[in-house]
Regions:
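N-terminal start-of-chain detector that recognizes signal peptides
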Residues: 1-2, 21-24, 71-74, 85-87, ...
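Flexible, glycine/proline-enriched loop segments at strand-loop-helix junctions
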Residues: 3-4, 77-80, 132-139
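Glycine- and acidic-residue-enriched helix-capping/strand-helix junction motifs
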Residues: 1-10
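N-terminal active-site beta-alpha-beta segment that forms phosphate/nucleotide-binding
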Residues: 9-90, 95-99
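Conserved phosphate- and dinucleotide-binding cores of soluble alpha/beta proteins
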Residues: 94-212
């Protein structure tokens, strides 16, 4: 990352964290990925059952491996042997102790914007797990809510369509087609503007470019 952009992130990150805190979320700014990983692990009690959405940022940071190395109980849908077992794990994740995810976008005034295909990730964000830890690079931050929605729809969603190899217009040409195709990954769009109960959602902002 170019040094001027890093300086910008380090100056704006604490301000975005403060905006999230005003909306009843716990929020932390970590200048580096390494510091962010340690903060996430610190926030997860040893006995918690942990699960996650399909989250590139958590994979990029190696958090799953760190959890396994300390024998953390996890619900990992990728270990399912059948479609039925995978679906059961998706349901189990909704009642886990700690759910890990990123956010498709975050507005500077502290609102989270997330788009989901089947809705399991945004369902967990809204209700179910005892706590939700959102880990997001500062590249996810947009100036305002309209910008955050635009980022989620026109940057994150087309990139995720490439990741999931779906048959959607954005998977073909890289641009949102506002589609209703069978493989559409934009079934649900959730804006989180306030957290109840207070502190259930914890956001770890990272002064690096992570995820999609």
């Amino acid at each position: 990352m170019l040094e001027p952009k890093k300086k910008m992130y380090d100056k704006s990150g604490p301000r975005v964290a403060a905006a999230l805190q005003k909306r009843n979320m716990e929020a932390y700014y970590c200048p580096t990925a390494a510091e962010a990983v340690e903060k996430v692990l610190e926030l997860i009690p040893a006995g918690d059952v942990v699960s996650w959405g399909g989250v590139a940022t958590v994979d990029e940071l190696g958090i799953k491996g760190r959890l396994r190395s300390r024998n953390q109980p996890v619900i990992d849908r990728d270990t399912a042997r059948t479609p039925e077992e995978r679906t059961a794990m998706l349901h189990q994740a909704l009642t886990c102790d700690t759910f890990l995810m990123s956010s498709n976008a975050i507005s500077e005034d502290g609102q989270l914007v997330n788009i989901d295909g089947i809705g399991n990730r945004v369902a967990a964000l809204c209700f179910g797990p005892k706590q939700v830890i959102v880990v997001a690079g500062m590249n996810k931050v947009a100036a305002d809510l309209d910008g955050a929605v635009s980022r989620a729809r026109h940057i994150a969603a087309p990139a995720n369509a490439q990741r999931f190899d779906g048959k959607t217009p954005c998977a073909v040409n890289g641009q949102c087609g506002d589609c209703t195709s069978p493989d559409c990954i934009c079934s649900q769009m959730v804006i989180t503007r306030f957290c109840k109960p207070a502190g259930r959602i914890k956001v770890v902002l990272v002064g690096e470019e992570l995820g999609l």
